[in-house]
Amino acid sequence: MARKYDLISELYNRTCKTVVSNPQNWQAFLASACRNYKLRYDEQLLVYAQRPDATAVLEIEQWNKIFGRWVNRGARGIAVFADENRSRQRLTHYFDISDTHESRYSRTVPIWDMRQEYEADVIETLESTFGEIENKSSLAEAIMGAARNAAEDNIPDYLQDLYYATEGSSFEEVEEDIVAFIYKNVVTNSVAYMMMSRLGVDTDGYFELDDFRDVTNFNTQETLNALGFATSDIAEMGLTEISKTITALNRQNRIIVGQDRNEYN
């Protein structure tokens, strides 16, 4: 296990460098991370490195006990660090839903999808979660406004960590107010990109690569952690509330469909 831990640590270090080497790589990571938004940032990074197409990951015991699904013979787990600070030097292994199959005890895995008819409700959820949104002309604009509000409210909780981590990075000789401006801008765009990706919004039609050009400044593991954890944490806040809204709407629709069928019969 020690040898595998070392290999995964090396993979993590390489991936940290790769994802900020250019805007496209960072966007690819965000598009992967949005599908497993409840994971820690460091877990999302390792899932991206090993299975960028994973849509829903759990440990084998959770697949068995919670959803009655069994992992396919020969399936390879996705190795992640057991704890954020890596103090125990242990790995946890996740399996994607595509690595599992149903049993007689299976329960539905609640993977939600955005529908056009849910747009008004989702925008209302974003506003109730992150505050008043000025531009609600489209779902993309509402998400962008929510991301700005969220960054404004939450960036101070992470900014000090970035200030402490600038040594040896592109930010080392940069004034703190400029560092803060760049940080807030990249986090805002990254949170919006994650939420848009999960909701099926055309990110290419909204963002340009130039919107993420400053990600290359987060060129040490410490500065990238400050970016990654803030982005992941804030995006999770929004996506968790959106998930509740969409799940409730899906449940209402099933009830209505059931009533219609009863009336027809």
Residue ranges and their predicted role:
Residues 1-265:
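N-terminal accessory/interface modules of nucleic-acid-binding and processing proteins
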